[in-house]
Amino acid sequence: MAAITASMVAELRAKTDAPMMECKKALTEADGDLAKAEELLRVKLGNKASKAASRVTAEGVVASFVGGNAGALVELNCETDFVAKNDDFLAFSKTVAELVATQNPADVAALSALPLDGSTVDAVRLALIGKIGENVSIRRFVRFETANKIATYLHGARIGVIVEYTGADEQVGKDVAMHIAAMKPVALSSADVPAELIETERRVAEQKAAESGKPAEIVAKMVDGSVQKYLKEVSLLNQTFVKNDKQTIEQMLKAANAAVQKFALFVVGEGIEKRQDDFAAEVAAQVAAAKQQ
């Protein structure tokens, strides 16, 4: 059997980006034949990628990019917070954000088909899955194109905001974006709050008010009051400015002769149900699988 040297492992790793141990295993299996080892490794990575691609991705990052008159916010998911800090994963996230801003894809499918590094975005994604051993997915993106100004804010890499605004002071845009990340409004104004959210809040308020035992007309006023309070709490313009509790966002903007046209807020994993592993069941499944082999 041919001796497997460190330089051979390094050369194979440079060609495939595979982990060192995987490279050594492939070279051993190929009896030192570099070309054969590369082929074996690509097959293994392909299998690894296809298996990983079915797993739940509830961790990840939000990335942003602003260039010219366009800006983008994207969410990419992985399986663990460890991989969410991986340099290759972070670099891919930033590249995807730039592609969204500059290429204006219609949806995630169109984005995935865009050319990248002599291949496509999706091919690069699959190669990344093979390299890091976890599923990686592009979940969503939003793109603003405007003659107005665009501001973005990232809180760590888990919360991202993009804002379209007008006004001479760029600090206003930064402040509004930071406020949105902290207070998480669901709409620009009370009139923009989705009807389904209002109905849910009204039902909750009705149930609480009904338990008070007060007359129907009082209950109706209590419900209306609760709904109005909710609308103020979740609409950006009505929220109290986090940097000055004496002002609402609307008042702050007016004082700065500025206005917000729209915004988007992404929180990593929002709405994704994380997989809760049953350790005992997992061990039992592994034992059963081993017996079948």
Curated annotation (Swiss-Prot):
GO terms for cellular component: cytoplasm. It is found in: Cytoplasm. The keyword Lyase does not apply. Residues 80-83 are annotated as: Involved in Mg(2+) ion dislocation from EF-Tu. Keywords: Cytoplasm, Elongation factor, Protein biosynthesis. GO terms for molecular function: translation elongation factor activity. Belongs to the EF-Ts family. Associates with the EF-Tu.GDP complex and induces the exchange of GDP to GTP. It remains bound to the aminoacyl-tRNA.EF-Tu.GTP complex up to the GTP hydrolysis stage on the ribosome. NCBIfam families: tsf. This is Elongation factor Ts. It comes from Burkholderia cenocepacia (strain ATCC BAA-245 / DSM 16553 / LMG 16656 / NCTC 13227 / J2315 / CF5610) (Burkholderia cepacia (strain J2315)). The gene is tsf.
